[in-house]
Curated annotation (Swiss-Prot):
Keywords: Acyltransferase, Transferase. Pfam families: Transferase (PF02458), TRI-like_N (PF22664). Induction: Expression and the subsequent production of PR-toxin take place under static culture conditions (oxygen limited), whereas no expression of the PR-toxin genes occurs under the strongly aerated conditions required for optimal penicillin production. There is a negative control of the transcription of the PR-toxin genes by the penicillin biosynthesis gene product(s), or by a regulatory peptide encoded by a small ORF inside the penicillin gene cluster. Monomer. Belongs to the fumigaclavine B O-acetyltransferase family. GO terms for molecular function: acyltransferase activity, transferring groups other than amino-acyl groups. It comes from Penicillium rubens (strain ATCC 28089 / DSM 1075 / NRRL 1951 / Wisconsin 54-1255) (Penicillium chrysogenum). O-acetyltransferase; part of the gene cluster that mediates the biosynthesis of PR-toxin, a bicyclic sesquiterpene belonging to the eremophilane class and acting as a mycotoxin. The first step of the pathway is catalyzed by the aristolochene synthase which performs the cyclization of trans,trans-farnesyl diphosphate (FPP) to the bicyclic sesquiterpene aristolochene. Following the formation of aristolochene, the non-oxygenated aristolochene is converted to the trioxygenated intermediate eremofortin B, via 7-epi-neopetasone. Its EC number is 2.3.1.-. This is Eremophilane O-acetyltransferase prx11. Pathway: Sesquiterpene biosynthesis.
Length: 471
């Protein structure tokens, strides 16, 4: 069972993130004559989930006069209870902008560039016109259903979003009995809704900002620019669409078979005796190399300026390292930076294993309980959680890789809907990020957003496409 924590309050790590929404899509084949029954199932189940955990109906408020610190986040939960209503969107009419059938999309592998967030998502990525913590939209197209789940990033990370969706599926599947179910014991959040080691007020009694601010590693594990205060401020809530990037960014999806992943891992075997890298380390190194070659072609011949550095950043879920309950849905996200000269990353003479082992060493070093507690301490004692600046240029010399391999979307049963056939994100949602999707039938897919010229260069890279199939 995917139980959720009983109560919810914002943590130090929640407050280090910008106020934006992100969207996940689950895709199901559904016949046209099942719309009424499907709609009733979804709304009844979401209402049941909201009744079980009323904080899911809440809104985010930033308190600029808080005694805790400037910009402290507060979760406002409606009292009396307000239901969480699904937006039902029928895209099957003759005047609809939507043209593809579900079978059309399925035949082409459900490509992200066909999934327009402006049509499918209740809260488009980057828009903060509402302060809801989550919203759901059910999009009916000919032959199918695309369910969009939008989450406020201050409220949940990818793991937390996945757990909420999984709990929703259990309500759809009829496996939750609210009258007889016991609240999860020992979730570590108690009635306050926050684990002690993430609580801003408690941490401010244990740590001092001036004792931590001189360590650049603590900033980077928070994904923040070293001492990046005062010169930049996030708005309370992003009020409109984020500006269009120039040059524009396009999304591409690539597939890696299990055989391709095994071969990449073999290529990335470190030269040092006894050294080990995971398949994920090898894939990150492979993606880093070929992304930098696409963006900086002269790095292949080591012709970039010798002092130019590149970072690959790997998202790390710290729940196990900090012994935080799996029922906790708030942000527990850390950011592992590995930096190398860009010529070394792109060079034909660099062994892939030399890159992969550096990625592994960075991740291993970050999985240290004392270190991560200090990272949270810095997050908690930062004097103004709006005056923060992020540390990497993901469309330039840096690459951010986030992996959703462990999210359970393809395992979930949704009652009469069965299992989802596809998990996707809308087009250009995570601009500049490389997102590794949960595996399906042994195949790992990833979605990457790049400037168009860079994307074309990547797709024409023979060494890259020997392992990766463009979808």
């Amino acid at each position: 069972m995917y139980e959720l924590q009983q109560h919810r309050r914002f943590s130090a790590l929640d407050e280090m993130l910008p106020a934006f929404y992100y969207c996940y899509l689950l895709c199901f084949p559904v016949s046209s004559d099942n719309r009424a029954g499907t709609s009733e199932l979804l709304q009844t189940s979401l209402s049941s989930l909201a009744e079980e955990r009323p904080y899911l109906t809440g809104t985010v408020r930033r308190d600029m006069e808080s005694s805790v610190r400037k910009g402290h986040l507060i979760l406002d939960i409606p009292n009396p209870f307000e239901d969480l209503r699904i937006v039902f969107n029928d895209l099957r009419g003759p005047k609809s902008q939507w043209k593809e059938t579900y079978q059309d999309l399925k035949d082409t592998g459900m490509p992200p560039h066909k999934l327009d967030a402006n049509l499918l998502a209740p809260l488009t990525a980057g828009i903060g016109e509402t302060r809801k913590v989550m919203s759901v939209q059910a999009n009916f197209i000919h032959g199918g259903l695309l369910i969009a789940f939008c989450f406020h990033h201050n409220f949940v990370d990818a793991y937390g979003a996945g757990r909420i969706i999984a709990r929703f599926s259990e309500h759809c599947n009829g496996t939750v009995d609210l009258k007889n179910s016991a609240d999860p014991e020992g979730d570590g959040t108690g009635s306050r809704g926050i684990a002690d080691l993430l609580d801003v007020e408690l941490l401010k009694k244990q740590y001092k900002f001036e004792d931590l601010e001189s360590d650049p590693n603590l900033w980077r594990l928070n994904c923040l620019e070293f001492r990046g205060v005062n010169d930049f401020r996030w708005p309370d809530f992003i009020p409109a669409l984020l500006p269009v990037r120039k040059p524009p960014v396009i999304s591409s999806m690539f597939s890696f078979s299990s055989d391709a992943l095994a071969e990449i891992k073999a290529m990335a075997q470190p030269s040092q005796s006894g050294a080990w890298v995971s398949t994920n380390d090898a894939l990150v190194a492979f993606l880093w190399r070929h992304t930098m070659r696409a963006r900086f072609p002269s790095s292949i011949t080591e012709s970039e300026p010798p002092n130019r550095k590149s970072n690959v950043v790997v998202a790390l879920d710290g729940r196990k390292d900090l012994s935080i309950s799996p029922t906790y849905i708030g942000n527990c996200l850390f950011h592992c930076f590995t930096d190398l000269p860009i010529n070394m990353v792109g060079s034909e003479s660099t062994h892939l294993g030399d890159i992969a082992i550096r990625v592994r060493q960075t991740i291993t070093a970050a999985r240290n309980e004392t270190l991560l507690k200090a990272v949270v301490g810095l997050a908690a004692t930062h004097p103004d959680c709006q005056a923060i600046k992020y540390a990497n240029d993901n469309l330039g010399p840096d690459l951010y890789v986030t992996s959703w391999i462990d999210l359970p979307f393809y395992k979930l049963e949704w009652g009469p809907l069965g299992k989802a056939e596809f998990f996707r994100i809308p087009d250009r949602q995570f601009e500049s990020l490389c997102c590794i999707l949960p595996p399906k039938d042994g195949v790992v897919q990833l979605i990457t957003s790049m400037e168009e010229d860079h994307s074309k260069r990547l797709r024409s890279d023979a060494e890259f496409t020997r392992f990766a199939t463009h979808r």
